[in-house]
């Protein structure tokens, strides 16, 4: 059975895309069939896997086919990466979809309808959400079985987390009663600083009794930052690094929770 996980946080710079790439590549290393969905008009996931920005067939194309009720090949947009993970790419043209969806009946279900056509092909579908709570993110959360929330252990992280959790609760109540929280993942973690330790503890104290918080944290490392320009995962770029080890541990936690 295919599991759809949205990686979401309306705050940028929390390693959503890095986590999508490396969780996906790690699941492939564990023998799973995985497709990544770039649901952000910035196209960072697409570029982070080494693909160009000017692709003609993208997530936008697939969603437009759904909206217009056309017959189409749902696999047409899928790109195959050398590490075995598949990708449904995006670029800046997807930004127009956020506005277009407001005029569509059942507008929150367009992405879900498309992904349903792919579920028989994959064990996991990971959606890299845009850093906002607009219509595309609503579509991603409506299509997902669970949401994984990357959080950088900073002072203001708790405010953004509270806002996102309210949105998730609303979507659970109105559109997607099956939506669960996969967990909160601390990213870009620098355990040497007491401030980061205090902020992590504050989030654990506030949310830990109701929401799963991953035991594994993702460190702030040079190698993880450098992978974005190399078009590969941390496993291909520096497989013996702390970053690679941390994402492999995260994969095991996700698999245990499946």
Indicate where each model-derived feature is located.
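P-loop NTP-binding core
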Residues: 1-258
């Amino acid at each position: 059975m295919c599991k759809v996980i949205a990686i979401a946080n309306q705050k940028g710079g929390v390693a959503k895309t890095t986590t999508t790439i490396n969780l996906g590549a790690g699941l492939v290393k564990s023998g799973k069939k995985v497709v990544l969905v770039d649901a952000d008009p910035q196209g960072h996931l697409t570029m982070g896997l080494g693909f160009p920005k000017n692709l003609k067939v993208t997530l936008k194309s697939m969603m437009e086919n759904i909206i217009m009720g056309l017959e189409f090949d749902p696999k047409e947009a899928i790109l195959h990466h050398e590490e075995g993970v598949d990708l449904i790419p995006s670029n800046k043209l997807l930004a127009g979809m956020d506005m277009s969806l407001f005029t569509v009946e059942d507008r929150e279900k367009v992405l879900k309808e498309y992904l349903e056509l792919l579920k028989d092909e994959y064990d996991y579908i990971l959606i890299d959400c845009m850093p906002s709570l607009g219509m595309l993110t609503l579509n991603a959360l409506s299509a997902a079985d669970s949401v994984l929330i990357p959080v950088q252990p900073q002072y203001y992280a708790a405010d953004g987390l509270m806002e996102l959790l309210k949105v998730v609760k609303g979507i659970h109540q109105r559109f997607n009663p099956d939506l669960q929280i996969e967990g909160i993942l601390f990213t870009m973690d620098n355990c040497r600083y007491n401030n980061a330790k205090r902020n992590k503890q504050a989030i654990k104290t506030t949310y830990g009794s109701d929401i799963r918080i991953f035991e594994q944290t993702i460190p702030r490392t040079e190698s993880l930052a450098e992978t974005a320009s190399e078009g590969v995962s941390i496993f291909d770029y520096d497989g013996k690094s702390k970053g690679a080890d941390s994402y492999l541990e995260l994969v095991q936690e996700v698999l245990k929770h499946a």
